[in-house]
Amino acid sequence: MSDKIKPSEAKRTEILDNVQQMTVDTKFEELGVGTETDKTRAFLKIQEGCNQYCTYCIIPFARGPLRSRSLESIRDEVGKLVAAGYKEVVLIGIHLGCYGKELAKEGKHVTLYDAVKAALSVEGVQRVRLGSLESVEVEPRLLQLMAEEPRLQRHLHLPLQSGCDKILRAMHRPYDTKRFTELVNEIRAQVPDVAITTDVIVGFPGETEEDFATTLPPPPPPAPAPLHTFSYSKRGVTPAAELREQYDDAVNSERAARLAKGDEGLHPRMLQGTVGKVDEALL
């Protein structure tokens, strides 16, 4: 392309902005879920979009603002899944803990608790499980429901991302390690046998060896439970992509391997806690 017809950087930005405005939805697209009768677990997306803008994440730019599936649609879709033979439904979303937040503008005051209640209200559903959500967005009444309702699985996936407060601030995470630990302790106090898993990102720009050492091993609670370890991956248009101290893949992979090795003892400890217990399996 010649310089004469190549768009200027300002023009390219204008074009991208216009395309984004045309393609970003403001309402949840209530698509149905495909069914396969030989499966026992189905995933139902009830929330789309994110407004957290973590500095490493491209999702808010790519997926747009918060949108939530209606309670009526949740009940309908869970009913269809049960009729198709599914025994467990996992409620998932991009920013699941913000379910219903944008609906307040329409006078509809609903939260993730209401979405879970809607799913549980469907006759024949044997289990309901939650996808990943932020620790700061776990409602006390949701925990009470989890403690009292046997069909709501006692499992929470709460991303930590780093055991270093400096890195958490740079990531624009909504907590520090002290607050995260307090929240996990509060959850365990209300639901003592809850299984808690987490995500950790290693190699974030500017993460020194000393910063990494605060996460290794293991990071602050939750434990004992396996960690999901990820190496930082640079994403264009995100603030983290502009940071000067970017590490190469070799450094990130080495740190991920060390964290995974430190995590090796957590899974056996979790399994040891189940010895002598009887639980239900879905087939």
Predicted regions and their residues:
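Residues in well-ordered beta-strands of folded domains
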Residues: M22, G131, L282
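Conserved SAM/AdoMet-binding glycine-rich loop
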Residues: A83-E209
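Structural detector for short beta-strands of small beta-barrel domains
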Residues: G273-L283
